[in-house]
């Protein structure tokens, strides 16, 4: 093993992760701010967050990224060792519903739902409470702990937000599944409403680094997305924010995004891999080489030893038969079921894979 990797491995393994809060009769402990948590690193007591293990520096991450290809397996092995110590519990699983689809005024180059692109993406208004409840129960029975309600558009209207919060109260009461909102840009007042309705987490991807963002989106500012993550965190919501790999960014820009996520102290990092969609500006972009994608995931684990890292959209197209390697690369969870506008892998196949790996019963 390269000396750099061995030194990083020893340093990260020597650190300790704070013990999670103990279970309660309701299934999970509740911190003093009464946010319902999933089986994730947000179960760490708030006063222990400052003692979370420190990841490698940006300079060290760049050095790892520059190692020759012959060291790729050693990079994965290093990340897997860190995952097994700091995030070695059962794989975290989340699922989503496309609760409002299409006609988005943003021009994100990767997105099928943008009104700027001719993709033939489904278009529908906000789903009713019964449909949202049915999808929640399906995911809960399949083993997902967290249910993401995702809507297209810059942000919800006040009426849509009220409707969704009313549905959330019922979903929490009847299924018990942890709720995550992915509803676009968020004001502090909207974040407070979501928390009161029973949402425990808010998802809002930065998508890419600040330096590469102008090549991906021109209809809103990078700081708008950062403000949303901060508003969610200030409201007591668990924050979930990551990006998409393979849009043409460099290794350094993926590391730049990782550093920004660390500055924001996000709880969970979803990693998506570009699946080029016909009709979008990135439709002809080749998929990322599988090993490069895995090494990039591994670097994120080294930078975030004790945070949740979930691999989500695009894993089928980019990784193919190497999908199970995401755990060898340091991920500790994944999205299951279908995505927003593309079909995911059969749930039974994913659960069988997890059982074979020993990361899920």
Curated annotation (Swiss-Prot):
<dbReference type="GO" id="GO:0009102">
    <property type="term" value="P:biotin biosynthetic process"/>
</dbReference>
<dbReference type="InterPro" id="IPR013785">
    <property type="entry name" value="Aldolase_TIM"/>
</dbReference>
<keyword id="KW-0408">Iron</keyword>
<keyword id="KW-0808">Transferase</keyword>
<dbReference type="GO" id="GO:0051539">
    <property type="term" value="F:4 iron, 4 sulfur cluster binding"/>
</dbReference>
<keyword id="KW-0479">Metal-binding</keyword>
<keyword id="KW-0004">4Fe-4S</keyword>
<dbReference type="InterPro" id="IPR024177">
    <property type="entry name" value="Biotin_synthase"/>
</dbReference>
<feature type="binding site">
    <location>
        <position position="111"/>
    </location>
    <ligand>
        <name>[4Fe-4S] cluster</name>
    </ligand>
</feature>
<dbReference type="InterPro" id="IPR006638">
    <property type="entry name" value="Elp3/MiaA/NifB-like_rSAM"/>
</dbReference>
<comment type="similarity">
    <text>Belongs to the radical SAM superfamily. Biotin synthase family.</text>
</comment>
<feature type="binding site">
    <location>
        <position position="240"/>
    </location>
    <ligand>
        <name>[2Fe-2S] cluster</name>
    </ligand>
</feature>
<protein>
    <recommendedName>
        <fullName>Biotin synthase</fullName>
        <ecNumber>2.8.1.6</ecNumber>
    </recommendedName>
</protein>
<dbReference type="Pfam" id="PF04055">
    <property type="entry name" value="Radical_SAM"/>
</dbReference>
<dbReference type="GO" id="GO:0051537">
    <property type="term" value="F:2 iron, 2 sulfur cluster binding"/>
</dbReference>
<dbReference type="GO" id="GO:0005506">
    <property type="term" value="F:iron ion binding"/>
</dbReference>
<feature type="region of interest" description="Disordered">
    <location>
        <begin position="14"/>
        <end position="38"/>
    </location>
</feature>
<keyword id="KW-0093">Biotin biosynthesis</keyword>
<dbReference type="Pfam" id="PF06968">
    <property type="entry name" value="BATS"/>
</dbReference>
<dbReference type="GO" id="GO:0004076">
    <property type="term" value="F:biotin synthase activity"/>
</dbReference>
<dbReference type="InterPro" id="IPR007197">
    <property type="entry name" value="rSAM"/>
</dbReference>
<comment type="pathway">
    <text>Cofactor biosynthesis; biotin biosynthesis; biotin from 7,8-diaminononanoate: step 2/2.</text>
</comment>
<dbReference type="InterPro" id="IPR002684">
    <property type="entry name" value="Biotin_synth/BioAB"/>
</dbReference>
<feature type="domain" description="Radical SAM core">
    <location>
        <begin position="86"/>
        <end position="315"/>
    </location>
</feature>
<feature type="binding site">
    <location>
        <position position="104"/>
    </location>
    <ligand>
        <name>[4Fe-4S] cluster</name>
    </ligand>
</feature>
<feature type="binding site">
    <location>
        <position position="108"/>
    </location>
    <ligand>
        <name>[4Fe-4S] cluster</name>
    </ligand>
</feature>
<keyword id="KW-0001">2Fe-2S</keyword>
<feature type="binding site">
    <location>
        <position position="180"/>
    </location>
    <ligand>
        <name>[2Fe-2S] cluster</name>
    </ligand>
</feature>
<comment type="function">
    <text>Catalyzes the conversion of dethiobiotin (DTB) to biotin by the insertion of a sulfur atom into dethiobiotin via a radical-based mechanism.</text>
</comment>
<keyword id="KW-0949">S-adenosyl-L-methionine</keyword>
<comment type="subunit">
    <text>Homodimer.</text>
</comment>
<dbReference type="InterPro" id="IPR010722">
    <property type="entry name" value="BATS_dom"/>
</dbReference>
<keyword id="KW-0411">Iron-sulfur</keyword>
């Amino acid at each position: 093993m390269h000396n750099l990797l061995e030194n990083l491995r020893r340093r990260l393994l020597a650190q300790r992760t704070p013990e999670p809060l103990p279970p309660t009769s309701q299934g999970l402990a509740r911190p003093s701010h009464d946010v319902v948590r999933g089986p994730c690193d947000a179960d760490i007591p708030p006063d222990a967050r400052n003692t979370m293990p420190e990841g490698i520096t940006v300079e060290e991450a760049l050095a790892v990224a520059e190692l020759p290809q012959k060291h790729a397996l050693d990079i994965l092995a290093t990340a897997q060792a860190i995952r097994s110590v700091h995030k070695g519990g059962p794989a975290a699983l989340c699922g989503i519903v496309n609760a409002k689809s299409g006609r988005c005024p943003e021009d994100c180059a990767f997105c099928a739902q943008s009104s700027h692109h001719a993709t033939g993406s489904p278009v529908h208004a906000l789903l009713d409470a019964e449909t949202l409840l049915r999808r929640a129960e399906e995911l809960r029975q399949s083993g997902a702990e967290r249910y993401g309600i995702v809507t297209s558009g810059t942000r919800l209207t006040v009426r849509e937000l009220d409707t969704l919060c009313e549905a959330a109260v019922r979903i929490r009461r009847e299924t018990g599944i942890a709720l995550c909102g992915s509803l676009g840009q968020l004001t502090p007042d909207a974040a407070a409403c979501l928390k009161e309705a029973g949402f425990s987490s808010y998802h809002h991807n930065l998508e890419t680094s600040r330096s590469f963002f102008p090549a991906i989106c021109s209809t809103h500012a990078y700081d708008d997305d950062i403000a949303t993550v901060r508003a969610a965190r200030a409201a007591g919501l668990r924050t979930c924010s990551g990006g998409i790999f393979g849009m043409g960014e460099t290794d350094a820009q993926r590391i730049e995004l990782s550093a920004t996520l660390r500055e924001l102290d996000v709880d969970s990092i979803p990693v998506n891999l570009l699946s080029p969609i016909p009709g979008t500006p990135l439709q002809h972009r080749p998929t990322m080489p599988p090993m490069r994608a895995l090494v990039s995931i591994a670097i994120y684990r080294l930078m975030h030893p004790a945070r949740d890292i979930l691999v989500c959209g695009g894993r089928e197209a980019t990784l193919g038969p190497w999908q199970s390697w995401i755990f060898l690369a340091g991920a500790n969870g994944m999205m299951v079921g279908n995505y927003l506008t593309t079909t995911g892998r059969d749930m039974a196949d994913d659960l069988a894979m997890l059982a074979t790996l020993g990361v899920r019963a």
